[in-house]
């Protein structure tokens, strides 16, 4: 188990066999050391209990039920009495069953096995360190070298620290005709294993010996010297040779970086060859009973069984059968290597292994990699509880710190809080009754949901979260539909728009998370870019288009509209198709409320010109501007008509009224700006 307070990061790397043994072995109170899995069995078909020393053994991995051993005896966990802490009959400790989630086991391999990730994955780290072709190493690991009758194919290189057969210093071939008949005799004697390990050391054992003999610092020095020599030679004039030199220099750089990484992390190269194979905790590879009494098992269990079967067969060949032919032993070693390869990465050597239904087994690599792997699904980008996801749409009537949640999402996110509210108000006797009321969507449910949401912020996140403004908190309100409503000014921080983007909703549960959401993450508290300090809540995209449409009324003045032949034709068309209002007569309004009311009643359009009474104390006339027309009334009052405004004067030339020529769109924008300025002024007055 990982303690989140002690461990702030996770690193995957190579470990030594001693470390694997320390993780997987444990000493039970009677002094016995357990941890090795030796049998390929899971559960007994009659008793339905885990087999001893099998893949689900309770002695190795802990009890299935807390405080109950394999015999059925029960002990209180943590009891300080003198009772033994384990069962003397079955050897199972009386501990919590959650130990089966992290207690590992191990398989002691009869022959060394290379880790397929470091051999077959590109680039091959083993081939890089040994400076040998990958094909040659594969032939050595999978025992294809010793039995290929091709005269041009060579044996593996002998280990230099051992006395070798006929003092071999390099690869040797079937150069002498008599060797074809004399050498195979050595592989049929009883001392085959001793001869092989002493003389030619094939298989993964040869790789392990060569990796153990490496001096990483010498590799770095020699690679650097060779790299400098290749750089000093310069171009040869032959394009093919120049490409080979460039590839060689790149290889030397990668080799030096790899050797430095091994030195920096205190990892020995021979750890890339496995002698002990870790066995995952049983709760991470479960066997589940489904309807009808059938069992459903993880694919990893079957792959582990195959490894144990082949490993036990190899052990029997080397121990019980003294006269086993060498070819059979090496073939069995190859089967063990392939079984471990399939367990770690199925299909990396060609066709993947399939079950009886022609379904590919999911190996350890398939479990942890990809979008549905352990890391991305359950650790990094996992779908957590109390979260939802939906498409975002614009909410023009929302405040900057609010967001609209659909009822369907809100009732799921806050269901536990609603259940608690129903029970506290004695509207439901238990959880079951409360859930039934929620399913029936009774009116009281929505009332309690509204109360809960008023005091609980939510977090909105849009992937990819590239900076801290990619996740912000909002005060949720209920909306109809199935989409999340969002204020358009916060889109720039999320790098979002309303063309189908989706956002995730999270509910902060702990008090610390709620405090952080309220004090630091609210959208109206993040108005500046954390990178450069510029305002980030500025109109973009849809808002700019909306402002343009809102203020797109004609600005050419009354002269252009009245005396332009094109406009006269347009006015005639509008007068024909519009019966509610004659466009040739522009209406007069006393205030902005009357103008907006006429627009809502569809008496005028958004861009229709109109006359709005203006305040007398605000100057609108330029000093050198003269009226275009002057209309006189019978009582002596007269109207001075300018391009964008109109003044009503009395007989004594006193200004009675001032009208400005505008549109409903301009009026709406002006009112919004006026309200914003008034709110800012009030906020400043409160601060002072």
From Swiss-Prot:
Keyword Metal-binding included in the entry's annotation: yes
Gene Ontology BP annotations: DNA-templated transcription
Protein residues bound to Zn(2+): 69, 71, 87, 90
EC number: 2.7.7.6
Cellular compartments annotated: Plastid, Chloroplast
Function as written in the Swiss-Prot or TrEMBL entry: DNA-dependent RNA polymerase catalyzes the transcription of DNA into RNA using the four ribonucleoside triphosphates as substrates.
Protein name per the record: DNA-directed RNA polymerase subunit beta'
Native source species: Sinapis alba
Gene of this entry: rpoC1
């Amino acid at each position: 188990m990982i303690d989140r307070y002690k461990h702030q990061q996770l690193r995957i790397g190579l470990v030594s066999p001693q470390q694997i043994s320390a993780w997987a072995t444990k000493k039970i109170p009677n002094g016995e050391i357990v941890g090795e899995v030796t049998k390929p069995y899971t559960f007994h078909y009659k008793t339905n209990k885990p087999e001893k020393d099998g893949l689900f053994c309770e002695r190795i991995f802990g009890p299935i039920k807390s405080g109950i051993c394999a015999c059925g005896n029960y002990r209180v966990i943590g009891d300080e009495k003198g009772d033994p802490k384990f069962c003397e009959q079955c050897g199972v400790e009386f501990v919590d069953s959650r130990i089966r989630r992290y207690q590992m086991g191990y398989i002691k391999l009869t022959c060394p096995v290379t880790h397929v990730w470091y051999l077959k994955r590109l680039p091959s780290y083993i081939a890089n360190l040994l400076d040998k072709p990958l094909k040659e190493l594969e032939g050595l690991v999978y025992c294809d070298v010793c039995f290929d009758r091709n005269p041009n194919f060579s044996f593996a290189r002998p280990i230099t620290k051992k006395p070798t057969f006929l003092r071999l210093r390099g690869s040797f071939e079937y150069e002498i005709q008599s060797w074809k008949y004399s050498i195979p005799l050595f592989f049929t004697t009883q001392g085959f294993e001793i001869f092989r390990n002493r003389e030619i050391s094939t298989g993964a054992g040869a790789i392990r010996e060569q990796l153990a003999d490496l001096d990483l610092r010498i590799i770095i020095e020699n690679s650097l010297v060779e790299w400098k020599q290749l750089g000093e030679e310069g171009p040869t004039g032959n394009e093919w040779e120049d490409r080979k030199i460039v590839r060689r220099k790149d290889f030397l750089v990668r080799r030096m970086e790899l050797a430095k990484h091994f030195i920096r992390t205190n990892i020995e190269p021979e750890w890339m060859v496995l002698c002990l194979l870790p066995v995952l905790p049983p709760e991470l590879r479960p066997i589940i009973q489904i309807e009808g009494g059938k069992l459903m098992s993880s694919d990893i269990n079957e792959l582990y069984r195959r490894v144990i079967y082949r490993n036990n067969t190899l052990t029997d060949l080397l121990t019980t059968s003294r006269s086993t032919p060498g070819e059979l032993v090496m073939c069995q070693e190859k089967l063990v290597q392939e079984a471990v390869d399939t367990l770690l990465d199925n299909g990396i050597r060609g066709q993947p292994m399939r079950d009886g239904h022609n379904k590919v087994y999911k190996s350890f690599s398939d479990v942890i990699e990809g979008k549905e792997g352990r890391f991305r699904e359950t650790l990094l980008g996992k779908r957590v509880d109390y979260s939802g996801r939906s498409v975002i749409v614009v909410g023009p009537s929302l405040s900057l710190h609010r967001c609209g949640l659909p009822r369907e999402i809100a009732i799921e996110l806050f269901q536990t809080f609603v259940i608690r509210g129903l029970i506290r108000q004695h509207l439901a006797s238990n959880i079951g009754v409360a859930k039934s009321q929620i399913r029936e969507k009774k009116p009281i449910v929505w009332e309690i949901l509204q109360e809960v949401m008023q005091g609980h912020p939510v977090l909105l996140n849009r992937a990819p979260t590239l900076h801290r403004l990619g996740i912000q908190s909002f005060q949720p309100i209920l909306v109809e539909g199935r989409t999340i409503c969002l204020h358009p000014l916060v889109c720039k921080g999320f790098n979002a728009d309303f063309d189908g983007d989706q956002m995730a909703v999270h509910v902060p549960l702990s008090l610390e998370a709620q405090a952080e959401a309220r004090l630091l993450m609210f959208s109206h508290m993040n108005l500046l870019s954390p990178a450069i300090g510029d305002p980030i809540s500025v109109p973009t995209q849809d808002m700019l288009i909306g402002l343009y449409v809102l203020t797109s009324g004609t600005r050419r003045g009354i002269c252009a509209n009245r005396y332009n032949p094109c406009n006269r034709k347009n006015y005639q068309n509008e007068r024909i198709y519009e019966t509610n209002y004659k466009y040739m007569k522009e209406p007069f309004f006393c205030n902005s409320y009357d103008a907006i009311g006429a627009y809502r009643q569809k008496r005028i359009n958004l861009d229709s010109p109109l006359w709005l009474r203006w305040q007398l104390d605000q100057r609108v006339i330029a000093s050198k501007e003269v009226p275009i027309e002057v209309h006189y009334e019978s009582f002596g009052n007269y109207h001075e008509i300018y391009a964008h405004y109109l003044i009503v004067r009395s007989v004594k030339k006193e200004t009675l009224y001032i009208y400005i020529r505008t549109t409903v769109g301009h009026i709406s924008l002006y009112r919004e700006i006026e309200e914003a300025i008034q709110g800012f002024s009030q906020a400043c007055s409160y601060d002072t």
